[in-house]
């Protein structure tokens, strides 16, 4: 839950999910001080990925080596918290407008939600905050590609991806294999 005062419960959600695993993790990284508040979230990356835990990195994170793991909740460049907060918001959006999730759902809809990784683009450093510059760059890039009739090409699922990646792991829009 993302609250109006900019507080959220991402660490509580991750702590709950982690409690379902036999090993420590898979979510990791919490803000200090913790004082035992998140007993099932290790501070540092746990051992056991791919054995007792899900894989640490999807194929896309192995391909884009600077991309962070979705399991990292805290620290520079982490995306785990964004994923935990963003997925329910996207799901809620689907109640109000025809929405598809790329690459899992390829049918036509009014809104297409896709995972992005701004670092695959040359970022226009035009804003005070780096995140704002990154979002502005990605939006402008996709807008230009759409005007030029090239966005459809970008949204074609790379042919070299296997079905497991397409249906289970997902992919980052615009990333090349």
Where do the protein language model's features map onto the residues?
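RNase H-like (RuvC/DEDD) metal-dependent nuclease/polynucleotide-processing core
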Residues: 1-177
């Amino acid at each position: 839950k993302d609250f109006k005062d900019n507080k959220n419960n991402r660490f509580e959600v991750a702590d709950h999910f982690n409690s379902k695993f036999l090993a420590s993790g898979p979510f990791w990284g919490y803000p200090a001080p913790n004082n035992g508040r998140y007993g099932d979230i290790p501070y540092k990356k746990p051992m056991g990925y791919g054995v007792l835990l899900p894989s640490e990195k999807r194929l896309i994170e192995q391909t884009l080596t600077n991309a962070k793991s979705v399991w990292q909740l805290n620290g520079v460049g982490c995306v785990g918290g964004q994923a935990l907060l963003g997925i329910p918001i996207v799901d809620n959006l689907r109640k109000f407008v025809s929405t598809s999730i790329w690459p899992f759902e390829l049918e036509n809809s009014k809104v297409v939600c896709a995972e992005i990784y701004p670092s695959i683009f040359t970022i226009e450093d035009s804003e005070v905050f780096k995140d704002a510059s990154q979002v502005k760059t990605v939006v402008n890039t996709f807008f230009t590609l759409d005007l030029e009739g090239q966005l459809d090409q970008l949204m074609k699922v790379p042919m070299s991806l296997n079905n497991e990646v397409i249906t289970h792991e997902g992919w980052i829009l615009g990333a090349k294999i």
